[in-house]
């Protein structure tokens, strides 16, 4: 018998699914008392090298309101060649191609190990991938040079049939015509005036070609006139490389004390409009590179006077940020237009000050695009992160999917409340849609324009079975995830994942339900919900809501005597959950103090799309200790772990930090590592560096690398993350010298837990 931990792990590896509960309460009333909803983290394109795509199309249920895909949970009558849908119980005839099936000769989609399966749609044309570069030229020469080199590098990684386009912007916006031999030709637009797709179509002479023509198969080899701005790489590789090399800084003079006039809002609007007119519903990626905030035209986020700083959280709270609402509205409209046509928007922002990510965040968030934030385009952090966008799989294909749609089907006793992640609603009302919305709800279909192997959505469900309608013994609830997308090879693919979980009566089998709790998944699902609320609610209100949910969970599943906090016990399945909540409350996802609005938007963007493992690291960073007393070991994220004779490696997802304890730092300063007799010290110093390099080489986006020591200014990154179990207030009461006192008034995990226990056992609660 496998344990729940093994069961959870197997399901994640096979199906890319993690549920908060792995046995479901069988009535609506009992489900609401569980505090944490029945919900799942789902990674649609979870990498499965052992799962080759199948070269035929899925068999669908014939009932028009169902259309579920044949799967291992369906009952099959091999003699009559019939199958019964496990969602609506409709009996269906197998298509003629299945005439040879039997108990001994089953198609792959009926085998239990293929609960996830990928089909290749052989109908329809194969479309090329489209990459449209949108480049800010109001940046320093050194930065611009580095950016040009990165873009030239990316051209060499694109498939030869991919179409590319180039738009540059400063005070004006230039759309470059790429088909001209020996001459640079571009259309110039004013950066202060927005254009509709129709106006753009007429101005660029795109209106002569019907939209349908641009999406038919033969047109790919013979690009229509509308492709003057989007040309195959193999045809214009040299020209575009030269054109990029010749790009100059924006020529408009910038007076003293002023910011350059930058028309980011209009540039992005033209990019969205260009793709809308020429290639709707085809996999396309707008890659926008910005080196500062928009200072004119629609979408501007700050004026051009340098003495007026860009908005802070304080300004926003005091309603003193005059451009935020208007700027956000402009970019939201663009994000929705791009999402409708299935196009992805990436934003690569590199500057020392804010660039307006707060206002622009909806563009990558709604289209499944990337958001990358750095100090300069001339850093390895940007260069390597950008290179990783073009990572390829073992078959030499990009690890990116385009124009995805996710449809979810459920059994009758459960409905879908909504999804939180990089998606937009397709407003598809079906029988399995709940009236209680969580996140993007009121639909059973979502559009995910850009997908990577780690893109993960949080899906929330509602048990609707009534209390007085018992589910038969041994009954199971089922959910089917159907993801259709354009593979980077140009093929349309459909990945189908079908899972089932047992029902249990919460009044008689509460132990079974409690034992099935996945505390890691639950923590991330509740965190996504809290961050989603934080976008529209006051920070303290969100923290209070989170605390209330935690107290209720402790009251429901803890073991205790009324009014006796010392008697409180949590079973192993719940024991880490309060600790996750403690670190979540202190995290930059919910605490905006000390972070700019752009930084908060950046952190939240990544949390809302990453898989479970990476999300857990973001909430509760991992700490490893290196010392002479043994091999490297994971240690508690606690101030007591900071010792003089230790090196610590902390991974927060966004940063990799190496911290040298006081003694180690002194030895390093004295140069002992360079003396042959202290070779073991040299190895000790090198070990965390090697481990850090491994993480730096594989993660997207590449983390910031920090090397610091006791008393170093950057040690603050470590001190702000660890649990302050020893502070300047209690350090002398411990009667020992271990650990480092943290100068903070924040409560420690111990104090937090004591308060939690007191509130959970209180009879007044």
UniProtKB/Swiss-Prot annotation:
<dbReference type="InterPro" id="IPR036175">
    <property type="entry name" value="Sec23/24_helical_dom_sf"/>
</dbReference>
<comment type="similarity">
    <text>Belongs to the SEC23/SEC24 family. SEC23 subfamily.</text>
</comment>
<feature type="binding site">
    <location>
        <position position="88"/>
    </location>
    <ligand>
        <name>Zn(2+)</name>
    </ligand>
</feature>
<keyword id="KW-0472">Membrane</keyword>
<feature type="binding site">
    <location>
        <position position="66"/>
    </location>
    <ligand>
        <name>Zn(2+)</name>
    </ligand>
</feature>
<dbReference type="InterPro" id="IPR037550">
    <property type="entry name" value="Sec23_C"/>
</dbReference>
<dbReference type="InterPro" id="IPR036465">
    <property type="entry name" value="vWFA_dom_sf"/>
</dbReference>
<dbReference type="Pfam" id="PF04811">
    <property type="entry name" value="Sec23_trunk"/>
</dbReference>
<dbReference type="InterPro" id="IPR006895">
    <property type="entry name" value="Znf_Sec23_Sec24"/>
</dbReference>
<feature type="modified residue" description="Phosphothreonine">
    <location>
        <position position="308"/>
    </location>
</feature>
<feature type="repeat" description="Gelsolin-like">
    <location>
        <begin position="632"/>
        <end position="718"/>
    </location>
</feature>
<dbReference type="GO" id="GO:0005829">
    <property type="term" value="C:cytosol"/>
</dbReference>
<dbReference type="GO" id="GO:0070971">
    <property type="term" value="C:endoplasmic reticulum exit site"/>
</dbReference>
<dbReference type="InterPro" id="IPR006896">
    <property type="entry name" value="Sec23/24_trunk_dom"/>
</dbReference>
<dbReference type="GO" id="GO:0000139">
    <property type="term" value="C:Golgi membrane"/>
</dbReference>
<dbReference type="InterPro" id="IPR012990">
    <property type="entry name" value="Sec23_24_beta_S"/>
</dbReference>
<dbReference type="Pfam" id="PF08033">
    <property type="entry name" value="Sec23_BS"/>
</dbReference>
<dbReference type="InterPro" id="IPR036174">
    <property type="entry name" value="Znf_Sec23_Sec24_sf"/>
</dbReference>
<dbReference type="InterPro" id="IPR029006">
    <property type="entry name" value="ADF-H/Gelsolin-like_dom_sf"/>
</dbReference>
<dbReference type="Pfam" id="PF00626">
    <property type="entry name" value="Gelsolin"/>
</dbReference>
<dbReference type="InterPro" id="IPR036180">
    <property type="entry name" value="Gelsolin-like_dom_sf"/>
</dbReference>
<dbReference type="Pfam" id="PF04810">
    <property type="entry name" value="zf-Sec23_Sec24"/>
</dbReference>
<dbReference type="GO" id="GO:0008270">
    <property type="term" value="F:zinc ion binding"/>
</dbReference>
<dbReference type="Pfam" id="PF04815">
    <property type="entry name" value="Sec23_helical"/>
</dbReference>
<keyword id="KW-0813">Transport</keyword>
<dbReference type="InterPro" id="IPR037364">
    <property type="entry name" value="Sec23"/>
</dbReference>
<dbReference type="GO" id="GO:0048471">
    <property type="term" value="C:perinuclear region of cytoplasm"/>
</dbReference>
<keyword id="KW-0968">Cytoplasmic vesicle</keyword>
<dbReference type="GO" id="GO:0005789">
    <property type="term" value="C:endoplasmic reticulum membrane"/>
</dbReference>
<keyword id="KW-0479">Metal-binding</keyword>
<dbReference type="GO" id="GO:0072659">
    <property type="term" value="P:protein localization to plasma membrane"/>
</dbReference>
<protein>
    <recommendedName>
        <fullName>Protein transport protein Sec23A</fullName>
    </recommendedName>
</protein>
<comment type="subunit">
    <text>COPII is composed of at least five proteins: the Sec23/24 complex, the Sec13/31 complex and Sar1. Interacts with SEC23IP. Interacts with HTR4. Interacts with SEC16A. Interacts with SLC6A4. Interacts (as part of the Sec23/24 complex) with SEC22B; recruits SEC22B into COPII-coated vesicles and allows the transport of this cargo from the endoplasmic reticulum to the Golgi. Interacts (via Gelsolin-like repeat) with MIA2 and MIA3; specifically involved in the transport of large cargos like the collagen COL7A1. Interacts with DDHD1. Interacts with TMEM39A.</text>
</comment>
<dbReference type="GO" id="GO:0030134">
    <property type="term" value="C:COPII-coated ER to Golgi transport vesicle"/>
</dbReference>
<keyword id="KW-0963">Cytoplasm</keyword>
<keyword id="KW-0653">Protein transport</keyword>
<dbReference type="GO" id="GO:0090110">
    <property type="term" value="P:COPII-coated vesicle cargo loading"/>
</dbReference>
<keyword id="KW-0931">ER-Golgi transport</keyword>
<keyword id="KW-0256">Endoplasmic reticulum</keyword>
<keyword id="KW-0007">Acetylation</keyword>
<dbReference type="InterPro" id="IPR006900">
    <property type="entry name" value="Sec23/24_helical_dom"/>
</dbReference>
<keyword id="KW-0597">Phosphoprotein</keyword>
């Amino acid at each position: 018998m496998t344990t729940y931990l093994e069961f959870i792990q197997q399901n994640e590896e096979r199906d890319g699914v993690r549920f908060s509960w792995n046995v479901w309460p069988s009535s609506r009333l009992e489900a609401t008392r569980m505090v944490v909803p029945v919900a799942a983290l789902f990674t649609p394109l979870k990498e499965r090298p052992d799962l080759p795509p199948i070269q035929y199309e899925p068999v669908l249920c014939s009932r028009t309101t169902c259309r579920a895909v044949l799967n291992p949970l369906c009952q099959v009558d091999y003699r009559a060649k019939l199958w019964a849908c496990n969602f609506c119980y409709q009996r269906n005839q197998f298509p003629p191609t299945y005439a040879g099936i039997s108990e001994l000769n089953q198609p792959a989609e009926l085998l239990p190990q293929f609960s996830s399966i990928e089909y290749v749609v052989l109908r329809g044309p194969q479309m090329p991938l489209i990459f449209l570069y949108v480049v800010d030229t109001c940046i320093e020469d050194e930065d611009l040079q580095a950016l040009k080199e990165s873009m030239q590098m990316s051209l060499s990684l694109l498939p030869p049939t991919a179409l590319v386009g180039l738009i540059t912007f400063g005070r004006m916006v230039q759309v470059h015509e790429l088909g001209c031999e020996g001459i640079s030709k571009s259309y110039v637009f004013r950066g202060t005036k927005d254009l509709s797709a129709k106006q753009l179509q007429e101005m660029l002479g795109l209106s002569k070609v019907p939209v349908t023509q641009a999406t038919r198969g033969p047109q790919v080899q013979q690009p229509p006139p509308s492709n003057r701005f989007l040309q195959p790489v193999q045809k214009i590789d040299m020209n575009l490389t030269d054109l990029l090399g010749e790009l100059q800084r924006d020529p408009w003079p910038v007076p003293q004390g002023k910011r350059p006039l930058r028309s980011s809002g209009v540039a992005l609007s033209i990019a969205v409009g260009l793709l809308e007119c020429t290639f709707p519903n085809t996999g396309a990626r707008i890659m926008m590179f910005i080196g500062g905030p928009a200072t004119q035209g629609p979408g501007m986020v700050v004026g051009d006077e340098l003495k007026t700083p860009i908005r802070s959280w304080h300004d926003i709270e005091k309603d003193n940020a005059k451009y935020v609402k208007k700027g956000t509205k402009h970019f939201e409209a663009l994000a929705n237009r791009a999402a409708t046509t299935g196009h992805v928007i990436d934003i690569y922002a590199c500057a020392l000050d804010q660039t307006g990510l707060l206002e622009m965040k909806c563009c990558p968030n709604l289209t499944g695009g990337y958001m990358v934030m750095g100090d300069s385009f001339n850093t390895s952090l940007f260069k390597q992160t950008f290179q990783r966008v073009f990572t390829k799989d073992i078959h030499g294909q990009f690890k990116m999917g385009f124009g995805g749609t996710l449809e979810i089907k459920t059994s009758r006793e459960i409905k879908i409340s909504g999804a939180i992640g990089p998606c937009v609603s397709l407003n598809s009302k079906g029988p399995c849609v709940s009236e209680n919305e969580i996140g993007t709800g009121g639909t059973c279909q979502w559009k995910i324009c850009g997908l990577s192997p780690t893109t993960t959505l949080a899906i929330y469900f509602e048990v609707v079975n009534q209390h007085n309608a018992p589910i038969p013994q041994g009954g199971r609830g089922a959910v089917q995830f159907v993801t259709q997308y354009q593979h980077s090879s140009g093929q349309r693919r459909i990945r189908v994942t079908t899972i089932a979980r047992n029902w249990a009566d919460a009044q008689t089998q509460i132990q079974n339900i409690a034992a099935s709790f996945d505390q890691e998944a639950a923590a991330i699902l509740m965190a996504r919900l809290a961050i989603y609320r934080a976008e529209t609610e006051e920070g303290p209100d969100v923290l209070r809501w989170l605390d209330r949910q935690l107290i209720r969970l402790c009251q429901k599943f803890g073991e205790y005597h009324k009014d006796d906090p010392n008697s409180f016990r949590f079973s192993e399945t719940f024991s880490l959950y309060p600790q996750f909540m403690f670190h979540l409350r202190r995290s930059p996802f919910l605490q905006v103090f000390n972070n700019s609005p752009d930084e908060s938007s950046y952190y939240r963007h990544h949390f809302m799309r990453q898989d479970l493992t990476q999300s857990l690291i973001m909430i509760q960073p991992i700490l490893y200790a290196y010392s002479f007393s043994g091999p490297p070991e994971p240690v508690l994220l606690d101030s007591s772990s900071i010792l003089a004779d230790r090196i610590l490696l902390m991974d927060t997802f966004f940063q990799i930090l190496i911290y040298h304890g006081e003694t180690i730092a002194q030895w390093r300063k004295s140069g002992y590592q360079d003396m042959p007799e202290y070779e073991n010290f040299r190895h000790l110093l090198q070990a965390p560096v090697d481990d850090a390099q491994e993480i730096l080489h594989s993660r997207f986006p590449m983390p910031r690398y920090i090397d610091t020591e006791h008393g170093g200014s950057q040690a603050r990154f470590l001190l702000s993350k660890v649990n302050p179990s020893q502070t300047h207030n209690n350090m002398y009461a411990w009667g020992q010298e271990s650990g480092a006192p943290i100068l903070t008034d924040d409560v420690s995990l111990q104090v937090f837990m004591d308060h939690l226990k007191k509130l959970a056992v209180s009879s007044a609660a």
